Regions:
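Zn-dependent metallo-beta-lactamase
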Residues: 1-23
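Rieske [2Fe-2S] iron-sulfur-binding domain
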Residues: 19-107
Length: 107
């Protein structure tokens, strides 16, 4: 299995509680900095495809709520925590490497 780290932002571009849209090969991904951790996830809510850039609200504990219908997702696992059992959010591993934030891709 191979691993690549794709730089998507500089570490100083995100403030605590902030989100930034990044393009990952034509796919729109959001990058967030919550609780000292970086998270990368799909821009679209899996419930009804709301744009989480505008409808999403970052919550303590590394979660995001889609304000259209109050669905909540864990940004580490993608699990829908409210309501339980709904379709998960697509998440990608993100980490700080030097002065850059990178998304880790495995194949």
């Amino acid at each position: 299995m191979g691993v690549s780290y794709i730089p998507v932002a500089r570490a100083d571009e995100l403030t605590p509680g902030g989100m930034k849209e990044v393009d990952l090969g034509g796919r729109q991904v959001l990058l967030a900095f919550v609780g000292g951790k970086y998270f990368a996830f799909s821009r679209q809510c899996p419930h009804e495809e709301a744009d989480l850039k505008t409808a999403g609200q970052l919550l303590d504990g590394g979660k995001i709520r889609c304000n259209n219908h109050s669905y909540c997702y864990d940004l580490s696992s993608g699990e829908c925590t409210l309501p339980k059992g709904a379709a998960p959010l697509t998440v990608l591993p993100a980490e700080e490497r030097g002065e850059e934030i990178c998304i880790r891709l495995e194949w």
